[in-house]
């Protein structure tokens, strides 16, 4: 088994709408002495993808609904931000105190529909999740492949966990690789057949990448080298989102 390396790509400028992320990442990696190579997995923070795609809103332009105003007044929240959270949601899964757990239009269940104000680039601005993170990942991967680098791409975002404290990064978009590694049908060294074991390697890689990234360190991209990923150009992140009919808790 080859050793696994994880390193961050720094030196990226503030991302503006229309930015060509693949080109910028390739240049920053080369400038930092760590050029991308075939077989790499490139994990890109969703926030810079959203900025490049113009997925930001100015809260001053938002007219909150009566519910957003009432709920925000009760819990000391910004009604414009609450309205954005509601607009980005398919439904509210849990509303407990000042916390809104929502299901996004992508099918993700997370706090505040993934809407975030940190590192937004300006006061009073909020960053939304990409409209189609798989399409975003495919576009970045296509840019890498055009430059001669066959690398897989994961778009990551930070999610909380229902049963544990602390947050971790998970994959919300993928291109070029299978997101799940199945052991079903295989046999362990003692002869026991695996019946249900499936590893979400996309989430594991996203979480590992966060160890060298972070909101305050200005390292929005990480490269994982040495992971033997399974090629799949038709893969989508929807395959890791559990269908509601099989969800025991929603």
Predicted feature residues:
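N-terminal, positively charged regions that mediate nucleic acid binding
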Residues: 1-65
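Phosphate-interacting basic helix/loop segments used at nucleotide- and nucleic-acid interfaces
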Residues: 19-34, 131-151
